[in-house]
């Protein structure tokens, strides 16, 4: 019986917490907004006939109150292999613009398998560290970004913020 009462109290605890949130300082790791995005096109700097220029990327990002972000993206790499990128990052306005920004993310990239496992550095275990810089433009709830994939490609994405 006591266990059931504790379970009920725990179930209602989030409701009590939100009522007290007005008086407390905001949680710096609270999510401020979400984004969903997809790839529009990829341009390879050294193109080959076998390169995939349509990555079918689907990405989601959470932007926190403290300015940091975290996200995941799933896509096909340049060799038509399914990949995942899990990352954290940050954005900075360009010249105090409300629209233009620079974004830098870093995380783990999975999916570059044989025979292309050596196309990205440090991919010994099938998972490699990655750093992806981007330039973005946002207008109201919409945005577009140009993401630099190492020295190999530039991918243009578009998405929505909510």
Question: What are the functions of these language-model segments?
Answer:
Residues 30-34, 66-68, 82-84, 98-102, ...:
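Outer-envelope beta-barrel architecture signal
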Residues 50-51, 103-130:
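Outer-membrane beta-barrel translocator/channel fold
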Residues 1-29:
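Cleavable N-terminal export/targeting peptides
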Residues 55, 83-85, 128-132, 153:
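Transmembrane beta-barrel architecture of outer-membrane proteins
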Residues 36-44, 68-77, 133-135, 139-151:
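Transmembrane beta-strand segments that form the barrel wall of outer-membrane beta-barrel proteins
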Residues 21-64, 73-74:
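Short glycine/proline- and aromatic-enriched beta-strand/turn motifs that initiate or cap beta-hairpins
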Residues 22-28, 64-66, 89-96, 139-141, ...:
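Outer-membrane beta-barrel proteins
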Residues 38, 58-62, 86-92, 104, ...:
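Residues on the lipid-exposed face of transmembrane beta-strands in outer-membrane beta-barrel proteins
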């Amino acid at each position: 019986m006591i266990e059931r009462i504790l379970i009920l109290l725990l179930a209602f605890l989030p409701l009590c917490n939100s009522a007290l949130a007005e008086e407390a300082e905001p949680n710096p790791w609270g999510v401020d907004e979400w984004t969903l995005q997809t790839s529009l096109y990829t341009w390879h700097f050294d193109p080959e006939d076998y390169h995939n220029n349509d990555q079918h990327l689907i990405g989601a990002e959470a932007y926190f109150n403290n300015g940091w972000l975290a996200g995941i993206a799933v896509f096909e790499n340049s060799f038509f292999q399914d990949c995942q990128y899990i990352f954290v990052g940050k954005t900075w306005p360009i010249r105090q613009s409300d629209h233009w920004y620079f974004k830098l993310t870093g995380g783990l990239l999975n999916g570059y398998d044989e025979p292309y496992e050596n196309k990205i550095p440090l991919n010994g275990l099938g998972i490699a560290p990655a750093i992806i810089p981007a330039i973005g433009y946002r207008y109201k709830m919409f945005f577009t970004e140009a993401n630099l994939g190492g020295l190999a490609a530039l991918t243009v994405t578009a998405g929505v913020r909510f």
